[in-house]
């Protein structure tokens, strides 16, 4: 049995990344291993049989065959302010691997040591944030949200020093790629059009190869020119941008559907592939309010729950700016060509939001008046501080047994008749639709925090594994589900999240 990595991103050249080895750790020990994900990635090892080898590979102590580790370069707008040089300050891209369907996936270590992008950081990660990323990404995957995932968490046997000493860990992240809006900004800020072309061509081949096929079919020249590093047409760039936009719509709408608050939607945390990335300061909605913020560093509520659609539009506009030189040498003409795509993106997001929220109350095809029905509901939820998940679960259950929980009936007594009248003729199909769009359990903040504390204190994963088993079936009730459905007794008072990984 062997595991061999390819190095497709590394082949782009030294301007895209820094070659650097992970820093060895003292006593690596495999804590969590994502067996289903490993199987999908055709990784031929198991925790039971290969724990020692896996701890060496995924701590960075031993290189996987074929691996040429790099720290990737990128820029980014952080809370609206541009930083021209960010990059992987404590992460190493080991390489990429194909899954059983032939799709390629990046394998990246986080907390694996310093690079030229570390900015005085120590390059390390504490165990708590590593566990948070594992829990949250697995929960989001099960909820049907596009997301990066965690393959492994390895403890290092060393302390990480923050406000106090913590156990250290290295987490392995799997992503369709780690190309960010900030990656494009990195080269645009430097006026490096050749590298922008190279990056765009790579991103098309990696994520949207159908654009190459379409261009080849429509071209009078069917030579290998389209495959060359820097040969890319204006039309291809526009089609690429449109394809990237289409990836962001299900991403941000899925966040809103399940009550997820990312917390740090900087352009360096916005992927071209449309995957959720960076779970450091994320949280889940309890009592509904569109201005909910948990991130301790989001002091101006820039990334509040209800602002996530508008921020995604802002981020995509920043991506559009980087592509202008590839669209047309005349900037005004380039803007004229790319602006309609952003306008359409805005319209698609608005329509998508209506369709998503309508599905949460059992309406498959929104009609005139449904927008008001939805707005009336969420206004009541905000005013009465109703729990986001529990409200939609109760409405779903009411179609199954024709009763609504008394507290909810009291609060929604004026709204419920309008809703019942709207879905009267298709209650059975409405119930089916609601079941698939309204999770009965989410990774609630207080439960996640409790497991992070207990795992760090005791090292016992028994209870955490039960929690993960529930989170992996968020639309189906199993024996343990009821243990994790409760909202926090004191609400979200004084709850804050922090960047960790």
Curated annotation (Swiss-Prot):
Family: Belongs to the SELO family.
Source domain of life: Bacteria
Protein name: Protein nucleotidyltransferase YdiU
InterPro entries linked to this entry: SelO (IPR003846)
Active site residues per record: 268 (proton acceptor)
Obligatory cofactor(s): Mg(2+); Mn(2+)
Catalytic reaction(s) noted: L-seryl-[protein] + ATP = 3-O-(5'-adenylyl)-L-seryl-[protein] + diphosphate; L-threonyl-[protein] + ATP = 3-O-(5'-adenylyl)-L-threonyl-[protein] + diphosphate; L-tyrosyl-[protein] + ATP = O-(5'-adenylyl)-L-tyrosyl-[protein] + diphosphate; L-histidyl-[protein] + UTP = N(tele)-(5'-uridylyl)-L-histidyl-[protein] + diphosphate
EC numbers: 2.7.7.-, 2.7.7.108
Role, per record: Nucleotidyltransferase involved in the post-translational modification of proteins. It can catalyze the addition of adenosine monophosphate (AMP) or uridine monophosphate (UMP) to a protein, resulting in modifications known as AMPylation and UMPylation.
Top EC class, one word: transferase
Molecular-function annotations in GO: AMPylase activity; ATP binding; magnesium ion binding
Residues reported to bind ATP: 87, 89-90, 110, 122-123, 173, 180, 278
UniProt keyword terms in alphabetical order: ATP-binding, Magnesium, Manganese, Metal-binding, Nucleotide-binding, Nucleotidyltransferase, Transferase
Organism: Colwellia psychrerythraea (strain 34H / ATCC BAA-681)
Binding site for Mg(2+): 269, 278
Pfam families assigned to the protein according to its UniProt record, in alphabetical order: SelO (PF02696)
């Amino acid at each position: 049995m062997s595991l061999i990595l390819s190095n497709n991103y590394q082949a782009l050249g030294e301007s895209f990344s820094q070659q650097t080895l992970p820093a060895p750790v003292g006593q690596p020990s495999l804590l969590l291993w994502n067996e289903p994900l490993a199987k999908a990635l055709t990784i031929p090892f198991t925790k039971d049989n290969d724990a020692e080898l896996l701890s060496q590979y995924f701590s960075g102590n031993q290189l996987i065959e074929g691996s040429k580790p790099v720290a990737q370069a990128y820029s980014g707008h952080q809370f609206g302010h541009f930083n021209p040089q960010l990059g992987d300050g404590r992460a190493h891209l080991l390489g990429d691997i194909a899954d059983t369907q032939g799709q390629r996936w990046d394998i990246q270590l986080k907390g694996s040591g310093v690079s030229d992008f570390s900015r005085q950081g120590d390059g390390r990660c504490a165990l708590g944030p590593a566990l948070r990323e594992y829990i949250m990404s697995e929960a989001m995957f099960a909820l049907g949200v596009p997301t990066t995932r965690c393959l492994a968490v390895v403890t290092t046997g060393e302390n990480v020093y923050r406000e106090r000493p913590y156990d250290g860990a290295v987490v392995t992240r799997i992503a369709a790629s780690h190309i960010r809006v900030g990656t494009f900004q990195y080269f645009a800020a430097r006026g490096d059009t050749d590298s922008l072309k190279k990056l765009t061509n790579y991103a098309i081949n990696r994520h949207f190869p159908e654009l190459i096929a379409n261009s080849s079919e429509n071209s009078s020249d069917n030579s290998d020119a389209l495959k060359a590093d820097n040969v890319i047409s204006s039309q291809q760039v526009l089609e690429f941008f449109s394809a990237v936009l289409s990836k962001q719509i299900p991403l941000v709408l899925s966040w809103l559907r399940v009550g997820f608050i990312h917390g740090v939607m900087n352009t360096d945390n916005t992927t071209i592939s449309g995957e959720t990335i960076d779970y450091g300061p994320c949280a889940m909605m309890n009592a509904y309010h569109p201005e909910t913020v948990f991130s301790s560093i989001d002091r101006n509520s820039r990334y509040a729950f209800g602002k996530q659609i508008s921020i995604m539009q802002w981020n995509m506009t920043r991506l559009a700016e980087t592509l202008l030189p590839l669209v047309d040498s005349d900037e005004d003409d380039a803007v004229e060509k790319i602006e309609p795509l952003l306008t359409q993106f805005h319209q698609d997001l608005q329509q998508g939001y209506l369709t998503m929220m309508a599905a949460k109350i059992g309406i498959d095809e929104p009609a005139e008046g449904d927008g008001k029905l939805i707005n009336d509901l969420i206004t009541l939820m905000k005013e009465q501080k109703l729990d986001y998940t529990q409200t939609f679960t109760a409405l779903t259950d009411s179609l199954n047994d024709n009763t609504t929980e008394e507290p909810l009936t009291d609060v929604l007594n004026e709204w419920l008749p309008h809703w019942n009248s709207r879905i009267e003729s298709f209650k059975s199909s409405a119930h089916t639709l609601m079941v698939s769009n309204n999770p009965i359990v989410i990774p609630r903040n207080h439960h996640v925090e409790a497991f992070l504390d207990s795992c760090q204190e005791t090292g016992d994963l028994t209870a955490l594994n039960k929690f993960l088993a529930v989170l992996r079936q968020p639309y189906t009730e199993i024996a343990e589900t009821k243990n994790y459905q409760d909202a926090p007794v004191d609400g979200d008072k004084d709850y804050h999240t922090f960047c960790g990984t």
